[in-house]
Amino acid sequence: MKANVKVFILSFFLALPIGAQTRFEEKVEEDFWLQSRNISGIREIPFYSARRGISFAELRAGIESGRFHDPSDADLAYGAGVRAGTLVHLPKTSMLGTFSFSERRGDGMCGSMFITPGSYPFDLFEFTPGGKTLQTYAFTGGLAHTLGQAWTIGGKMSFESANYAKKKDIRHTNYRLDLSVEPSVLYRHDDYRLGASLLLRKQSESVSAEQIGSATADSYFAFLDKGLFYGTSQVWNGSGIHLAETGLNRFPVTILSYGGALQASLMEKLCGEVAYIHSEGEAGEKGFTWFRFPENTLSAMVEFRWGGSITQWVRIRYEGRSLSNYETVLDRVTSGGITLPVIYGENRIYRERKDRLSMETEGITHGGSGFLLHLAAARYDRRSFLMFPYYARSREVLADGNFSIWHSFGPWRMTLGANFRTSLFDKDSLEMLPDGGTAAESEPYRLTEWYLPSHEFRLAPRCGLRLAARYNFGKGFYAEGEGSLVRGFRLAYLDGRARIMGGLHFGLEF
């Protein structure tokens, strides 16, 4: 009992960021142009101080504890990091920049070998618990320059690099790179603003696995999830897993994206944006392409803003995503002692459609108090997997939301928040296609022991509370402690019902 109390106290005061925001983050949260894809709009952000800018730098450390988590996460995880941000106005030029570094470690981890499980329409699983360490570096730089009275041009570049390592067989090392470039333009006339921007983005991640211990390779199995936890289970270096193939010693994934967005604003009271992005992803390299997964994303945002004793805005967002995953029919042909890959065709084995509609509103008083309410009115996910003659389908409808309220008095600022998530509809089925014949083949293999807890964690009803207290020492220096508790309900497959998080932050605003 005493040990549990100590863990709770430690978790309450030490963890990942969940509480109050800096002035820089508040500006990013409340301003339409900083929420849009048009960096040229930062010239429209007003400043009411002589410094014409806001900046911050912060050190942080944290811990998470509890068994209410995705099966690929750790019961106990801890980390630390540093971050900084700045937004500055010069006579004709405005600049935005952010930087962050973080390290997170979890013990007794296994499951998904990717840095962010669920990022792709496939996944790789290993089953030997061990410690994993994730390091992430990221920066963003943006610039907007005014040309005359009507035009502003700008550009933004974002870069993120991450490395992920497990130190126990099956050992694996991941490297991820994410680079995006967004040029933009803004036209200004009286109270009207019209903008346009382009997006070019490249994402890549590779998984390199190895075995150093004396055990035979047959002692370690892996699973390639091709959709809805259906797939191939073999020894980790088997040909069906693609972790150790002839000529390839890693599992690489590459995604190239391009698209554009249009923005409009009327008197800074009514603003809107619509964006379209097309992505082409593939797994494999050197001609050995195992999967190809194109994706289309359409998003829209509308914001209403008004003033008075409480400055308030309402923002409505929609995002629709459609993805298909094609598995190639691939062979190796040897000629003259040289082995080359030959692709005979491809089969669509997985489809995914996601729609999300959300609303958020914030109100800020002139005395330093305020509230932020976020509600996801609908989140409808449809997924299907085909392994002839069987067809699996999953349909889910979720709702979630969170609420925060803060108040400043003297050097203190207190923040209290609550959140929830629940499933409104959930149906999973496996059927035989009408033209599948009378002699039914065996059902496709499913990693049920991982599917059930993962599915439950994503859909289980839950609610959470969070509390943060910040003390301002003067001259911009501050210290903050924060903590949160999440509790799940109606659980059957997860090992725990709660997770606690907390953290300490020390920073400077200037």
Task: For each feature predicted by the language model, list its residue ranges.
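Residues that define the transmembrane beta-barrel architecture of outer-membrane proteins
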Residues: 76-82, 133-139, 173-181, 252-258, ...
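Membrane-embedded beta-strand positions of outer-membrane beta-barrel proteins
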Residues: 57-59, 97-99, 155-157, 183, ...
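Transmembrane beta-strands of outer-membrane beta-barrel pores
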Residues: 61-65, 101-105, 159-163, 189, ...
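Outer-membrane beta-barrel "beta-signal"
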Residues: 23, 187-191, 498-510
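N-terminal, post-signal peptide beta-strand-biased segments of exported outer-membrane/organellar beta-barrel
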Residues: 19-107, 120
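Long, internal scaffold/assembly segments composed of regular secondary structure
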Residues: 232-370
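Outer-membrane beta-barrel translocator domains and adjoining extracellular loop/strand segments
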Residues: 67-74, 108-114, 164-172, 207-213, ...
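Outer-membrane beta-barrel channels and translocator barrels
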Residues: 90-93, 146-150, 188-190, 265-269, ...
